C-alpha cells in the first residue's frame, strides 16, 4: 500500500549512542521507535525494550500509521528515529518508497564515551553489553542490507 509522499520522511539509524535523538532537531515531527515499543510492552526497562524482535509487525504498522497521521497534519519533515530491524524498514519502504535512509556513523570509542557520560537511568549495564545485545546487532543488519540506499553521516 504505497503512500503518496507529499512530505519528507527520513528514517534515521545508528548503533547505540550514535546521536539519533539529536539528529534532525528541526524536524516537524519526530517519531521515536523506543517510545512505541514502551507503549506496546508497558515498560521502559532497557532489557525489556531490547527484547522486542518479535514485535516487528506491530511496530511497523504503528510507525506507518503515525507517519500517515503526521502527514495528514501537514508536517513537512517527519523523522523516524531508532528502527532496529530490517523487516520494519521494509514495511515502511513498501508504504513510503521515497523515504530517505540516514545512517549515523560514530566510532565505538565515541559511542562508549557518550553512553558513560549520559548516565541515563535505563543504562543498567556496561556499554559493551548494551552494544552487543541482539537488537543492536540487528541494527547493524540494516546497514548491511540497505548500504546502497543509505546516506552515511559521520556524526561526531
Language model segments and positions:
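P-loop (Walker A) phosphate-binding loop of NTP-binding proteins
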Residues: 15
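Small-molecule kinase domains that catalyze NTP-dependent phosphoryl transfer to phosphate-bearing small molecules
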Residues: 116-156
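Conserved phosphate-donor/acceptor-positioning beta-strand/loop module used by diverse small-molecule
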Residues: 81-83, 94-118
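ATP-binding Walker
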Residues: 18
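Extreme N-terminal, non-catalytic leader segments
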Residues: 1-8
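Walker A/P-loop
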Residues: 21
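ATP-dependent small-molecule kinase phosphotransfer cores
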Residues: 30-79, 83-90, 123-125
Amino acid at each position: 500500500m504505497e503512500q503518496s509522499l507529499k512530505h519528507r520522511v527520513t528514517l534515521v539509524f545508528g548503533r547505540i549512542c550514535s546521536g539519533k535523538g539529536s539528529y534532525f532537531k528541526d524536524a516537524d515531527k519526530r517519531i521515536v521507535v523506543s517510545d512505541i515499543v514502551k507503549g506496546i510492552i508497558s515498560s521502559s526497562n532497557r532489557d525489556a525494550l531490547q527484547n522486542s524482535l518479535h514485535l516487528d509487525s506491530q511496530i511497523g504498522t504503528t510507525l506507518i500509521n503515525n507517519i500517515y497521521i503526521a502527514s495528514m497534519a501537514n508536517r513537512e519533515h517527519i523523522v523516524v528515529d531508532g528502527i532496529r530491524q530490517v523487516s520494519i524498514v521494509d514495511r515502511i519502504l513498501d508504504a513510503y518508497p521515497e523515504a530517505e535512509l540516514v545512517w549515523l556513523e560514530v566510532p565505538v570509542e565515541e559511542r562508549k564515551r557518550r553512553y558513560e557520560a549520559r548516565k541515563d537511568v535505563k543504562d543498567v549495564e556496561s556499554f559493551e553489553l548494551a552494544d552487543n545485545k541482539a537488537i543492536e546487532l540487528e541494527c547493524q543488519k540494516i546497514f548491511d542490507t540497505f548500504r546502497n540506499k543509505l546516506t552515511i553521516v559521520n556524526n561526531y
